Amino acid sequence: MLDKEVLVIGAGLAGSEAAWQLANSGVPVKLVEMRPIKSTPAHHTSEFGELVCSNSFGALSPDRAAGLLQKELRFFKSLIVQTADKFAVPAGGALAVDRSKFSYALTEQLSNHPLVEIKRFEQLDIPSEENITILATGPLTADDLSYKIQDFTGIDDCHFFDAASPIIYGDSIDQEIVFKASRYDKGDPAYLNCPMDENKYIHFRNELIEGEQANLKDFEKESANFFEACLPIEEIARRGVDTMRYGPLKSIGLWNPKWGDLFDRENRLKKRPHAVVQLRKEDLEGKLLNMVGFQTNLKWSEQKRIFRMIPGLEKAEFVRFGVMHRNTFLESPKLLLPTLQFMKRENLFAAGQITGTEGYAAAAAGGLLAGINASLLAKGKKPVSFPDESMIGSLMNFISNKNQILSNQKKNKFQPMPASFGLVPELTKRIKDKRLRYKAYQERSTEALNDFKNKLDSCFDKDHLLSKIY
């Protein structure tokens, strides 16, 4: 006999992951997605898990917070991360994907699962209390549902502004000017690099600052606050002459062999560019390239004019221009438990960026936890929290304020949080060396999750997702 059906609203990264976890545990799922009936300011397709900003999931190495989070998700057979691994493109030490193949594969896998029923319509309200429901509508939740969520929580939503970088055709780049390299020669030479001298950099910065901005809606103009990890490039430029050079345009660790001996200090200081614009592959063939760190709210005509001032991009043809959009998130510390259940309704979950986690892997982590817990609830069992020692657990603890990390004052100023070693509990023994400390965090996480997985397996039948994938 099948368990009671669970409703998942939103087929982004979190919703797709949640639906997969539920279905693989034997729980039927109704997955509701409003696209293509209604789109958003940032989406371009109707595929599930469309990546609207970067195509990167962050650092691969588990001695980085993003890498440890990915490792934990692989351990629990995350649909999102396993699919990302399958459609990865070269990106140095990061996990980046061919976004078209990635989202198409997610859609196909979920569409072909016998326990997943897909419905394409706009969900206008929160379903009745009879339904186990996961809200995974993301930062671009449609207005009608957003208002219903505000009515339910009694709290106005929070928001910030996010932006996406332009994508250009690889064959429109001047290959005589750009060079292939990864920073510090880490991994394959995954990036194309556009070097700039000081004069060109100064001129480029001035044009960025003076460039005409796209119009914001009236309600957006009232509070155009940005998320620091995804600032528009023109906003970074305004912060100081050298701010871009120590951010997305830094030249440190990048070297073109044509410039001569890297280890000749005099030559290195003479030849090293003042700044470098990096281009990252969007697909394996390199036909499409993303301008790394070039999120922007410039008008499209201004993007074409100004970005063609970059050496090597004088004749660049744009597949997609950068855009800025308003992202909504819940004031989660006042609303959610570490299980991702709403405090005031145990069979209603929230997952993904709407909860205030930042980053693709973090969204998948929320979907994974919400899916597991909705499955447990459907089976009449008690939802679980991930171990504090894990990156998944630490993120969920932060957004739910489990360990009182946020003071009452800061709870009123809750802002999205990416994976960070600053969230995990301190080690019992202080380790000064950062690399060794991060390695210890990783080892502690692995041990805690092994114990947690064994206990979780006992809650499910032998065919549960943790032991046998559909």
From Swiss-Prot:
GO cellular component, one term: cytosol
Annotated residues for binding of FAD: 10-15
Gene3D superfamilies in the cross-refs: FAD/NAD(P)-binding domain (3.50.50.60)
Catalytic activity: uridine(54) in tRNA + (6R)-5,10-methylene-5,6,7,8-tetrahydrofolate + NADH + H(+) = 5-methyluridine(54) in tRNA + (6S)-5,6,7,8-tetrahydrofolate + NAD(+); uridine(54) in tRNA + (6R)-5,10-methylene-5,6,7,8-tetrahydrofolate + NADPH + H(+) = 5-methyluridine(54) in tRNA + (6S)-5,6,7,8-tetrahydrofolate + NADP(+)
Keyword list, A-Z: Cytoplasm, FAD, Flavoprotein, Methyltransferase, NAD, NADP, Transferase, tRNA processing
Entry's transmembrane regions: none
Reported cofactor(s): FAD
SUPFAM superfamilies: FAD/NAD(P)-binding domain
PROSITE patterns: GIDA_2
HAMAP family: TrmFO
Full protein name: Methylenetetrahydrofolate--tRNA-(uracil-5-)-methyltransferase TrmFO
